[in-house]
């Protein structure tokens, strides 16, 4: 492929970049309505979504949570520092929490963020490593903010590597940071059109996770939690099995994949939501496009709805693009304009000729901050 072709080709991806970040924010904002709910009837979900069409509600009526707040910190750090800078990213996390603590942060991560705020802290990974008696967190907090890594790095290896490092700032258990890698890889593959072949998409993710779960630390953590030796691979195989069935109930999805705050119980679930909603489904309006179906279905699962919808929205948005997202949904959610701006900045740098000629430097893209 010529250099000119490599420069022109990414132009078609602008919509996908924007869709990924905006879809993430929408899932977070819209999903907050049902967070923690055990039973979420589909008609309640559809009623909630139809209310977004009401022009009298005003802009920013649905607030974003810590999911979006921390995702923005990741994006800003990558854009500003040119590479993954753990200290810069950690400081942004701490500053964001201090500025706006009422975003629904969990008690565990709050302890970490307060320690990260200390000017005397030498190792920014240490507070997370000290969590839960040294076992670290296996929650989905690293995965919920992983989208910018999928946009900032070209190679799959770098997406995998740096999304894990970014998650380790708050989640030092391999179940936590490997979940972040899985989410980032799913968005990365979706950006490249891999969802056109759903089974190949899953197979690629399984292959990636097999490499990560061969690690001795991952094996140790899985054993300590009484899980299978390759927990994410096992869940992804369950996703494939569910996809092969002619009929799947919400109860079965929750039983097989989960809907909780653990990364293992939510990242594969988000991936399933996207795959399941590639085609129209009973109970969902025919007028809904794929992204709308994905978010609606994510909410109907209950549990950690804002984060599951956030992750599913990012993967779906990277596939369908910004034009698939209803404008009424966008203006009803806080932080959409900022997410769109971050996506455009990442995209603009992605298209720079000098960047395309220097594909092997393993650095994320950045802006000039002068």
UniProtKB/Swiss-Prot annotation:
The keyword Nucleus applies. The record marks 35 as: Glutamate flap. InterPro entries: ADP-ribosylglycohydrolase (IPR050792), Ribosyl_crysJ1 (IPR005502), Ribosyl_crysJ1_sf (IPR036705). It catalyses: [(1''->2')-ADP-alpha-D-ribose](n) + H2O = [(1''->2')-ADP-alpha-D-ribose](n-1) + ADP-D-ribose; 1''-O-acetyl-ADP-alpha-D-ribose + H2O = ADP-D-ribose + acetate + H(+); O-(ADP-D-ribosyl)-L-seryl-[protein] + H2O = ADP-D-ribose + L-seryl-[protein]; alpha-NAD(+) + H2O = ADP-D-ribose + nicotinamide + H(+). Its cofactor is Mg(2+). Substrate binds at residues 66, 135-141, 171, 225, 261. Keywords: Chromosome, Cytoplasm, DNA damage, DNA repair, Hydrolase, Magnesium, Metal-binding, Mitochondrion, Nucleus. It is found in: Nucleus; Cytoplasm; Chromosome; Mitochondrion matrix. Binds 2 magnesium ions per subunit. GO terms for biological process: DNA repair; negative regulation of necroptotic process; peptidyl-serine ADP-deribosylation. The protein undergoes a dramatic conformational switch from closed to open states upon substrate-binding, which enables specific substrate recognition for the 1''-O-linkage. The glutamate flap (Glu-35) blocks substrate entrance to Mg(2+) in the unliganded closed state. In presence of substrate, Glu-35 is ejected from the active site: this closed-to-open transition significantly widens the substrate-binding channel and precisely positions the scissile 1''-O-linkage for cleavage while securing tightly 2'- and 3'-hydroxyls of ADP-ribose. Its EC number is 3.5.1.-, 3.2.1.143, 3.2.2.-. GO terms for cellular component: mitochondrial matrix; mitochondrion; nucleus; site of DNA damage. Mg(2+) 1 binds at residues 66-67, 306. Mg(2+) 2 binds at residues 35, 304, 306-307. One of its GO terms (molecular function) is hydrolase activity, hydrolyzing O-glycosyl compounds. Belongs to the ADP-ribosylglycohydrolase family. ADP-ribosylhydrolase that preferentially hydrolyzes the scissile alpha-O-linkage attached to the anomeric C1'' position of ADP-ribose and acts on different substrates, such as proteins ADP-ribosylated on serine and threonine, free poly(ADP-ribose) and O-acetyl-ADP-D-ribose. Specifically acts as a serine mono-ADP-ribosylhydrolase by mediating the removal of mono-ADP-ribose attached to serine residues on proteins, thereby playing a key role in DNA damage response. Serine ADP-ribosylation of proteins constitutes the primary form of ADP-ribosylation of proteins in response to DNA damage. PANTHER family: ADP-RIBOSYLGLYCOHYDROLASE, ADP-RIBOSYLHYDROLASE ARH3. Monomer. This is ADP-ribosylhydrolase ARH3. It comes from Danio rerio (Zebrafish).
